[in-house]
Amino acid sequence: MSPKVAYISSEFALSDELPTYAGGLGILAADLLYQAAESQFPLCGISVFFHEGFFQQKVGPEGKQEHFYDRIDPLKAGLVDTGQSVRIPLTDHEITLKIWRKDVSPTNKPNNQSTSPLYLLDADIPENTPEDRKFTDRLYERVWAPHLIDDLVLGVGSVRAARKLGLPIKVWHINDDHGTFNIMERLREYLEKGLSFPEARERVKAETIFTTHTPVAGAESKFSREEISFTMNALFNGLDVDPEEIWNLGKREWEGEEVFSLTVFAMRHARAINAVSRKHFDISRELWKFVNGEIPTAYVTNAVYAPRWTAKELGKVSAESTDKEIREAKLQAKKSAAETLGHLAYDKRRFDPKALVLVWARRFTEYKQPALLVSDLDRLVKVLISNDKPVYLLMSGKAHPEDPQGRSFVKQVIDASRDPRLEGHLIYFPNYSLSLAKELFAAADVWLNTPKVGWEASGTSGMKAVFNCALNASSPDGWWAEGFNGKNGWEIDPPDAENVYGLLEKEIVPIFYDQKEKWAAMVKESLRSCGPRFNTPRMLEDYRKLYGI
């Protein structure tokens, strides 16, 4: 099956052996590939093979985060050399990109021979200079915003790789603005064929879908006139187009200066622009209204590929299961997770699988409020420590190496976990990964999420918790703003310490221990109301309608 849709993303989170992802962007991209394979939908992914991926985390003896990088073995990661390569222009010379391929198969249908290919671009080859080979070493090494050259490799390289491989792509889906130079490269192609610039723009727009992920003003990729001019000269030199016209199509004001926004440029060259949740859609339409009407025209709420994330003990549980079936399956999943997690904890502590288990696991950054739960240890002791109603709080997540505040949050949580008053009921797990996340989903009775409202575009971890018979307690943001119905979990509004502690004390702990029938009813309602809506078959169908395929 030849792919007709190319999904361009800087991250794909396929496995721990191929950690070319930093977070939710990559998990979303990978889950879409899995679903496309299962549904036999003609979609491929194109990204970059970062040889050291994203950083690995460890915790030093003083409780401080340390980071290091492991070199990825392409063969162990399941990559296959296509034998093909392409060249792309930089500011003053060209580099060669090797093309790797990885086939993604559905996880729950072993007899399904359908696969979705992921193509990865690689500059670390002998044809390039030692300096140029480093361009595909590390993902987001210094700052969260991608570097200009990283974007060139992904954007320009994705088009040239598809052409070299003979892929009959009809629709280009740009997942966030990291792939925007894909649009510029296709403009260049049409100009070389003799089309006028307006004609080239119309052709490109007709074949482009753009997904925006940021809900925050100014958080997109932005470059100065000097930075972007080198790129435009490299791509459009000798063609009938005014560089100033291209600049104006991406220009925006930011902090008193004119900058080139990749998001603005992408929005002006896409026939469909989608946000990733209903709330994000509302925020985005206000956020991008200055782009002359080229604002998000739809929303496709993110979803997860459930077979990939559901513990095997819970694979047959549904909203129609009996209370006893749900309780027994969940306990078995927790027991299995407890055994594995005991070896992964920072201090090798273990939790009692029969106790109520709370989990908070995601990136340690300010807007997600990772230290909220440990902001009042006296109160936390009252929640966690009880002879007849014990509670465990499991936490995990990395802070970017260049985010000192995030790193301080990690230390704050680890310091709290050492407080003797908590008796080992707060456990931190370093080096958050896909495999660790799966164990935490299986362990969780309640999945906690505390972002500042308006800052979470969607989020998907809580969706995975649903399929593992965990209940969500979250800020009314992202996907939970449309998932919560008053009977399938809890809303933390506003997401402050008093509300979290109060909710745990007055509702969550008493219901878990004293109202088992109500707890089971809430789990069933969560499965019934959220399962079909936040599963990738629905998401792929929504995108299929946008693709027109």
Question: Could you tell me what each predicted segment is?
Answer:
Residues 1-549:
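Catalytic cores of carbohydrate-active enzymes across secretory and cytosolic contexts
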